[in-house]
Swiss-Prot record:
GO CC term (a single one): cytosolic small ribosomal subunit
Superkingdom to which the source organism belongs: Bacteria
GN (gene name): rpsR
Protein name: Small ribosomal subunit protein bS18
HAMAP family membership: Ribosomal_bS18
Assembly and binders: Part of the 30S ribosomal subunit. Forms a tight heterodimer with protein bS6.
Length: 91
């Protein structure tokens, strides 16, 4: 079966796909970070979901080396009460 062609189908190809996903890249590799610090709360909060869960690497694009450091840093920050365990513990 031949592909449909014509003016109508060209317009569809030119429209931006609403399900388009941006190419994932590791923020830490791009920034040249050696070690992720548990005291850097702004960075850690970017990788914690609204329900308090750590966002997986397959969604963020973080490399496994940095994902392990990120998990450890978030868990340390939680233990020291710098970051809440869940969204239920807001002050």
């Amino acid at each position: 079966m031949p592909r449909p062609t014509g003016k109508k189908f060209d317009k569809r190809r030119q429209q931006q796909n609403p399900l388009f996903k941006r190419k994932k890249f590791c923020r830490f590799t791009a920034a040249g970070v050696d070690h992720i610090d548990y005291k850097d709360l702004e960075t850690l909060k970017d990788f914690i979901g609204e329900n308090g869960k750590i966002t997986p690497a397959r969604l963020t694009g973080t490399k496994s080396h940095y994902q392990r450091q990120l998990d450890t840093a978030i868990k340390r920050a939680r233990f020291l009460a710098l970051v809440p365990y869940t969204d239920q513990h807001k002050a």
